[in-house]
From Swiss-Prot:
A family per Pfam: Ribosomal_L22
Phylogenetic lineage: Bacteria, Pseudomonadati, Pseudomonadota, Alphaproteobacteria, Rhodobacterales
Protein name: Large ribosomal subunit protein uL22
Gene Ontology MF term list: rRNA binding; structural constituent of ribosome
Example of a GO cellular component annotation carried by this entry: cytosolic large ribosomal subunit
Keyword tags: Ribonucleoprotein, Ribosomal protein, RNA-binding, rRNA-binding
């Protein structure tokens, strides 16, 4: 008579990972997310490894977490995984300031964002 198990939030052949508080704007993060959408996970990992974008390393960690979740928690085959979805959301915006001329104050916005990566197992095509 234990605790009831929560229902799955994704389909049987899917797994996901979410990373919050990434110190970049959602617009810049979405450029990296668009780079991996729809690709096989090994190709997406290679693209992130050699990307010149600063945030690509954090996206790579999130993708590796999604792959590990698929393998360990959902018993999916890693060789047949694709990046089904990768979406980006806004998080908080830290507000900072800089003194300006004539006693004024310039606002500096430091945005944070979050990314969710969903991987799906596809059937092997013969």
């Amino acid at each position: 008579m234990g605790k009831e198990q929560n229902p799955r939030r994704v389909a049987e052949n899917e797994a996901f990972a979410k990373t919050k508080m990434l110190r970049t704007s959602p617009q810049k993060l979405n450029l990296v997310a668009a780079m991996i959408r729809g690709k096989k996970v090994d190709k997406a990992l290679a693209d992130l490894t050699f990307s010149s974008k600063r945030i690509a390393g954090d996206v790579k960690k999130c993708l590796q977490s999604a792959i590990a979740n698929a393998e360990n928690n959902h018993n999916l085959d890693v060789d047949n995984l694709i990046v089904a979805e990768a979406w980006v959301g806004k998080n908080l915006v830290m507000k900072r300031g800089r003194p300006r001329a004539r006693g004024r104050y310039g606002k500096i916005m430091k945005p944070f964002s979050e990314i969710t990566i969903k991987v799906r197992q596809v059937e092997e095509r013969a």
